């Protein structure tokens, strides 16, 4: 029996590459490594992070637009961003859902702001948004950035720090995030290129994380037998490489 928790996502379904159905109009797709390469790795992670962005992620842009990032929530930011995202860019993760066709309305039920396209009978309220973004983050191992500043001086410092980071990153040569991971998995697992191209992004990241857990457990066990690691200071969970990854 499946969980009745609306925020729950079956990890096994993600692992085998199943799309996650929010409702009849909204489905989160899981691309393969090959899909991401064909789309363009840089463009893919750019659109992913834009869709999943929190106000803290965009504090510089919001500040430059006269908005304090701590005075809006995640859904309000998404409502601002969504109309600028054409379906051609988002289709790799959201299929036919056209965010650029959505407009802001007030719900007749509770007065809350919603995004909707009445002609297509598409509606995104806060709950639907949270379910959609929760799925995309879980697929890619992303954590929400909800950092806050405790005073104005700290706020200005955080904004300037992010601005400097953005400027430095803009001057760097483009590099691949996936290549070192793919290369490592191939060397460790002996997978062929064709096999990796067919791997869903969730199962691929799961493999990367699992390999790290296995290596760590092996080193701990080796250290225990050699007498260089005190077994009393190591939890049994750390030695169990088949444990659930979190």
Residue ranges and their predicted role:
Residues 76-171, 175:
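Hydrophobic, aromatic-lined core segments that form the binding pocket/scaffold
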